[in-house]
């Protein structure tokens, strides 16, 4: 019964092994948090010098020098055995292609960073990955701050309109 429910996605598998593609600032912050929570973290980064840097600041992570969009490297690094894949390269297209490959390889949890809204909605529509967008996260935080500040000072919002697929708000 457990296997059946798991296949339906009704039982979440515990995530232990996380593979991150790309070694930028978001990766560093995320890897630090994951390592503190005792996850096994492996990072694939293209730039050799950056791999050296990552290995010094993230000594408990496994750092791999290679192209994370190369299917052979992904297979060598055990993409089929990873519990979660997080695509954080600087290229939306590369992140999407890697996510689609991970989906084909049946990775349990796929998280993809995209900056282009139409790409985000495409990935969410086909159900390949959970999508994060730094721009949307930032704007959401700013809006939350402005609203809390306005509420603190007794602001009365009479009407709030959401436009363009909830991406624009007019007061």
Predicted segments with their positions:
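Cytosolic regulatory regions of ion transport systems
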Residues: 1-171
């Amino acid at each position: 019964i457990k296997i059946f429910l798991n296949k339906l996605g009704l039982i979440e598998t515990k995530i232990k092994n996380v593979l991150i593609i790309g070694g930028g600032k978001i990766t560093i912050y995320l890897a630090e948090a994951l390592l503190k929570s005792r996850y096994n973290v492996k990072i694939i980064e293209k730039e050799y010098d950056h791999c050296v840097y990552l290995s010094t600041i993230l000594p408990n992570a496994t750092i791999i020098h290679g192209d994370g969009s190369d299917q052979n490297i992904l297979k060598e690094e055990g993409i089929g055995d990873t519990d979660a894949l997080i695509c954080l390269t600087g290229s939306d297209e590369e992140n999407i292609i890697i996510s689609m490959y991970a989906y084909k390889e049946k990775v349990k949890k796929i998280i993809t960073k995209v900056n282009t809204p139409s790409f985000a909605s495409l990935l969410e529509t086909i159900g390949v990955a959970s999508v994060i967008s730094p721009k949307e996260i930032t704007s959401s935080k700013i809006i939350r701050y402005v609203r809390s500040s306005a509420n603190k000072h007794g602001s009365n919002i009479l009407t709030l309109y959401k436009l363009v697929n909830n991406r624009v708000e007019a007061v």
